[in-house]
Curated annotation (Swiss-Prot):
Residues 16-29 have a biased composition (Polar residues). Residues 59-70, 79-88, 744-755 have a biased composition (Basic and acidic residues). Keywords: Chaperone, Eukaryotic host gene expression shutoff by virus, Eukaryotic host translation shutoff by virus, Host cytoplasm, Host gene expression shutoff by virus, Host-virus interaction, Inhibition of eukaryotic host translation factors by virus, Late protein, Methylation, Phosphoprotein, RNA-binding, Translational shunt, Transport. Induction: Expressed in the late phase of the viral replicative cycle. All late proteins expressed from the major late promoter are produced by alternative splicing and alternative polyadenylation of the same gene giving rise to non-overlapping ORFs. A leader sequence is present in the N-terminus of all these mRNAs and is recognized by the viral shutoff protein to provide expression although conventional translation via ribosome scanning from the cap has been shut off in the host cell. It comes from the Viruses. This is Shutoff protein. Belongs to the adenoviridae shutoff protein family. Residues 726-743 have a biased composition (Gly residues). The gene is L4. Residues 1-88, 684-807 are annotated as: Disordered. GO terms for cellular component: host cell; host cell cytoplasm; viral procapsid. The modification Phosphotyrosine is found at Y365, Y682. Residues 756-765 have a biased composition (Basic residues).
C-alpha cells in the first residue's frame, strides 16, 4: 500500500489501475478466494476493489488459482478481440483516450493548489485558486517572435463566456445612482448638440464654483410624444420610469422607452483608488474611525470622527471668524476632494497630446479605420486581431472590428460614441486598478506626510480648481502619470466593448437581448444638467464624442480606388494618405519589385541587400508619424485647410525622392518591355482589364481585277435578284438554281465558274473568303476564330443577308 500511494499522484489514475478496472469489467467469471487478514495499521484508506494493485493481488491469490485466472484472462482477451473485430471502437486503441481530458484537468488543478498548504474544501476557494493560476500567474507567459504570448492550453478548461473575478479587480465596481431626468436619452436634440465641426476644441472640466445651479429636469424644449404610453392605474398619468417618450426620439430610443422602465443605473466606478481616497479624506476632511476592539477603552479621547482642521485653526488661516465663510470653505474643500480632483486627474491623463495620439491609434485598430485598414490591405495581415491587457499582447481572431459599418446616420454615431465612451471607462479603470495594486503601507504613510506638509496651502487656496490642481500634484505625481500613460491604452476590439456593455447593462437590471440600450444613454451631456457625482461620466462622454470626431470615425468618407482607405484625421492625412502623399503612393507601387545589393566585403560572404517587402513597408508605415501636423486639441482636418502641411510629404522607407523616381522608372520600363515582348495576356491586378490587348488583324487590301471591276454593278443587281430565287446573293456563295450544273456565276450566266472568275488564281479566291470576317460573339480576337460577316439576326425584310462591311 505504501508503494502504491507513493507512485500514484493527483494528476491522473495510474496505468495499472485503468487496466485493472477494464479487466475486471470484462472478466466472465470470478473465484472467491480467502485473503489473509490484514493488519489494522495497514488498512488506512478504503480502496475500491476495481483499483487493486498487482502486488496486493499476488500476495492474496494462491499460485494455482493465479494460473487459472491467467488462463481465463487470456481466453477473455481473445473473446474481446473477436468482439472488437465485429464491433470495433477506435477510441479503445491503447489507453482510453477519453481519460486524457480528465488527466489534463487534474494536472491543472494540482498545479493551482501547489501554492496552498491545505487543500481547500469550498468551491469558491478552488475557483479562486484556479483563476489566480490561470490569469495571474507568478511567472509571466513566454513571448513569441511575433510579440504575442504563447497559447495557454490551461484556458481550455475555463468557462468561455464567464467573466473571471480575478481579472475584474476594479471593473466589477459600480456606482449605483438614480438616473437623472436630463440624461442623454431624454434629449431628442442630443445628436445635433454633440455634432462637432472644423475648429472645435477638446472639452474642459468644470467645478462647482463655475456651475452653481444644476437642472435635472426635462426642459422646455422637449415635448412628450402624442402617442406615449400611459399607465392605467396612475392617477396623475405619470410614467414610473425615468425615460420619457418624446416627439423627436429616433427609432432606437422610441423602442427602448417602450421596452423598459428604469429608475437607477449601475455606472462604472471612476473613483480614484480607495487607498488614496481614504488617506486624503482622513487627512483633509474628517478623521477616519477605526473599528472598535474588545479591549478598547471607550472613555479614551480620540480624534476619530472629528474634522481634520478645527474651526480655530481654519479661522487663523483664513483670518476671519465668520461662520458663513468657514462653512463655505469647508464646502469648497469637500467638493474639491470628492469631485474636482477626480476630473483633474482624468484631464491630465487623457488630454496629454501623446496620450491622445495613442488613444486615437487604438481606435483606428478597434474600428479598422484609415491607415490601419491600408496597412492590413498591403501586408495581407489582419492587424486588428491583436488585443492586449496590461501590456501583454494576444492574438484573438474571434473579435470583430467592422460591424459599425453596417450602421448609418444617427444610429452609427450613437454606437461609435458609446464604444469610445466605454473604451475610456475601461482604460481609466485599468489605470486605477494598477495604481491600487501597487500601493503599499509605506507609500500611504509617505502620502500622509505630504498631505500634512501641504495642509495649510490646500485649505487656503484661491478657488476650487486651484485646490484640485494642488491636490492632484500630490496624489497623482508626474512619475505615476507618465508610467500609466506609457502602458496604456490597451488594444481592444468591438467584441470586448460589447461584452463590457452587456456586463454593465446586466448589473443595472437591463436585459440586453430585449432592448437596444447603450450605457451612454443614461449619462447627461452637460455639466449644468448632471449631478456632481456623475461629472466624471459626463466628461468622458464629451471626450469620447470629441475623439470620435477627431479620429473621423463618425462618418464613412471612404470611396473607390485610392479612396478605399481614406480617413481625414491628422493621423492619416496627409502623411499616411495615398491620395495626398504622392511619394508614399509611388513607394507603395514598387513594393516587392526590386532588391538593392551592395558590394560584398569579401568574396565568401554575400553583401547585405535591401528588399522592400510588404512586411518591411508596413512596419515603417505604422511607425510613420509627423507631430508637426498633428493637432491634438483642435479638429483641423487637412482637407479643410488652404495652407500646405508643416512638414514635407515623404515616403516611409525610401525618403529620397530621386531614388524613388529612378526605381519607379525602372519598374515601369520593365513592365512596358513585358507588355511588348512578353507572351500571353497581362491583366491589371486591380481592375482585371487587359494591359496588352491583341490588336485585330489588319484587313487585306482588296484589289479587284478589271474584269471583276467592270462587272461590279451587274454583280450587285444579280445578287439581289438571285436572293429572291434561293441562289447565292454575294461573293463566295454558290449559284444554286442556275441554268444547269455548270451555271451559277456571279450574274447567273452560263459558263462562268462557280467561285469567282479565273479558276487558276488563288489570290482572288482567298480575298473572297477573307472579305467581311468578324470575330465570334464573346470570343477573344485571337487566332482564326472568325465567322463570315453575315448578320443572321432579322433586320428589315425576312430572308435577306447583309454583310457588315457594306454600308
Amino acid at each position: 500500500m505504501e508503494s502504491v500511494e507513493k507512485k500514484d499522484s493527483l494528476t491522473a489514475p495510474s496505468e495499472f489501475a485503468t487496466t485493472a478496472s477494464t479487466d475486471a469489467a470484462n472478466a466472465p467469471t470470478t473465484f472467491p478466494v480467502e485473503a489473509p487478514p490484514l493488519e489494522e495499521e495497514e488498512v488506512i484508506i478504503e480502496q475500491d476493489p476495481g483499483f487493486v494493485s498487482e502486488d496486493d493481488e499476488d500476495r492474496s491469490v494462491p499460485t494455482e488459482d493465479k494460473k487459472q485466472d491467467q488462463d481465463n484472462a487470456e481466453a477473455n482477451e481473445e473473446q474481446v478481440g473477436r468482439g472488437d473485430e465485429r464491433h470495433g471502437d477506435y477510441l479503445d486503441v491503447g489507453d482510453d483516450v477519453l481519460l486524457k481530458h480528465l488527466q489534463r484537468q487534474c494536472a491543472i488543478i494540482c498545479d493551482a493548489l501547489q501554492e496552498r498548504s491545505d487543500v481547500p474544501l469550498a468551491i469558491a476557494d478552488v475557483s479562486l485558486a484556479y483563476e489566480r493560476h490561470l490569469f495571474s500567474p507568478r511567472v509571466p507567459p513566454k513571448r513569441q517572435e511575433n510579440g504575442t504570448c504563447e497559447p495557454n492550453p490551461r484556458l481550455n478548461f475555463y468557462p468561455v463566456f464567464a467573466v473571471p473575478e480575478v481579472l475584474a479587480t476594479y471593473h466589477i465596481f459600480f456606482q449605483n445612482c438614480k438616473i437623472p431626468l436630463s440624461c442623454r436619452a431624454n434629449r431628442s436634440r442630443a445628436d445635433k448638440q454633440l455634432a462637432l465641426r472644423q475648429g472645435a476644441v477638446i472639452p474642459d472640466i468644470a467645478s462647482l464654483n463655475e456651475v452653481p445651479k444644476i437642472f435635472e429636469g426635462l426642459g422646455r424644449d422637449e415635448k412628450r410624444a402624442a402617442n406615449a404610453l400611459q399607465q392605467e392605474n396612475s392617477e396623475n398619468e405619470s410614467h414610473s420610469g425615468v425615460l420619457v417618450e418624446l416627439e423627436g426620439d429616433n427609432a432606437r430610443l422610441a423602442v427602448l422607452k417602450r421596452s423598459i422602465e428604469v429608475t437607477h443605473f449601475a455606472y462604472p466606478a471612476l473613483n480614484l483608488p480607495p487607498k488614496v481616497m481614504s488617506t486624503v479624506m482622513s487627512e483633509l476632511i474628517v478623521r477616519r474611525a477605526q473599528p472598535l476592539e474588545r479591549d478598547a477603552n471607550l472613555q479614551e479621547q480620540t480624534e476619530e470622527g472629528l474634522p481634520a482642521v478645527g474651526d480655530e485653526q481654519l479661522a487663523r488661516w483664513l483670518q476671519t471668524r465668520e461662520p458663513a465663510d468657514l462653512e463655505e470653505r469647508r464646502k469648497l474643500m469637500m467638493a474639491a476632494v470628492l469631485v474636482t480632483v477626480e476630473l483633474e486627474c482624468m484631464q491630465r491623463f487623457f488630454a496629454d497630446p501623446e496620450m491622445q495620439r495613442k488613444l486615437e491609434e487604438t481606435l483606428h485598430y478597434t474600428f479598422r479605420q484609415g491607415y490601419v485598414r491600408q496597412a492590413c490591405k498591403i501586408s495581407n495581415v489582419e492587424l486588428c486581431n491583436l488585443v492586449s491587457y496590461l501590456g501583454i499582447l494576444h492574438e484573438n481572431r474571434l473579435g470583430q472590428n467592422v460591424l459599425h459599418s453596417t450602421l448609418k446616420g444617427e444610429a452609427r454615431r450613437d454606437y461609435v460614441r458609446d464604444c469610445v465612451y466605454l473604451f475610456l471607462c475601461y482604460t481609466w479603470q485599468t489605470a486605477m486598478g494598477v495604481w491600487q495594486q501597487c500601493l503599499e503601507e509605506c507609500n500611504l504613510k509617505e502620502l500622509q506626510k505630504l498631505l500634512k506638509q501641504n495642509l495649510k496651502d490646500l485649505w487656503t487656496a484661491f478657488n476650487e480648481r486651484s485646490v484640485a490642481a494642488h491636490l492632484a500634484d500630490i496624489i497623482f505625481p508626474e512619475r505615476l502619470l507618465k508610467t500609466l500613460q506609457q502602458g496604456l491604452p490597451d488594444f481592444t476590439s468591438q467584441s470586448m466593448l460589447q461584452n463590457f456593455r452587456n456586463f454593465i447593462l446586466e448589473r443595472s437590471g437591463i436585459l440586453p437581448a430585449t432592448c437596444c440600450a447603450l450605457p451612454s444613454d443614461f449619462v447627461p451631456i452637460k455639466y449644468r444638467e448632471c449631478p456632481p457625482p456623475l461629472w466624471g461620466h459626463c466628461y468622458l462622454l464629451q471626450l469620447a464624442n470629441y475623439l470620435a470626431y477627431h479620429s473621423d470615425i463618425m462618418e464613412d468618407v471612404s470611396g473607390d480606388g485610392l479612396l478605399e482607405c481614406h480617413c481625414r484625421c491628422n493621423l492619416c492625412t496627409p502623411h499616411r494618405s495615398l491620395v495626398c502623399n504622392s511619394q508614399l503612393l509611388n513607394e507603395s507601387q514598387i513594393i516587392g519589385t526590386f532588391e538593392l545589393q551592395g558590394p560584398s566585403p569579401d568574396e565568401k560572404s554575400a553583401a547585405p541587400g535591401l528588399k522592400l517587402t510588404p512586411g518591411l513597408w508596413t512596419s515603417a508605415y505604422l511607425r510613420k508619424f509627423v507631430p508637426e501636423d498633428y493637432h491634438a486639441h483642435e479638429i483641423r482636418f487637412y482637407e479643410d485647410q488652404s495652407r500646405p502641411p508643416n512638414a514635407e510629404l515623404t515616403a516611409c522607407v525610401i525618403t529620397q525622392g530621386h531614388i524613388l523616381g529612378q526605381l519607379q522608372a525602372i519598374n515601369k520600363a520593365r513592365q512596358e518591355f513585358l507588355l511588348r515582348k512578353g507572351r500571353g495576356v497581362y491583366l491589371d491586378p486591380q481592375s482585371g482589364e487587359e494591359l496588352n490587348p491583341i490588336p485585330p488583324p489588319p484587313q487585306p487590301y482588296q484589289q479587284q481585277p478589271r474584269a471583276l471591276a467592270s462587272q461590279d454593278g451587274t454583280q450587285k443587281e444579280a445578287a439581289a435578284a438571285a436572293a429572291t430565287h434561293g441562289r447565292g446573293g454575294i461573293l463566295g456563295q454558290s449559284g444554286r438554281g442556275g441554268f444547269g450544273r455548270g451555271g451559277g456565276g456571279h450574274d447567273g450566266r452560263l459558263g462562268e465558274p462557280r467561285r469567282g472568275s479565273f479558276r487558276g488564281r488563288r489570290g482572288v479566291r482567298r480575298n473572297t473568303v477573307t472579305l467581311g470576317r468578324i470575330p465570334l460573339a464573346g470570343a477573344p480576337e485571337i487566332g482564326n476564330r472568325f465567322q463570315h460577316g453575315y448578320n443572321l439576326r432579322s433586320s428589315g425584310a425576312a430572308g435577306t443577308a447583309r454583310s457588315p462591311t457594306q454600308p
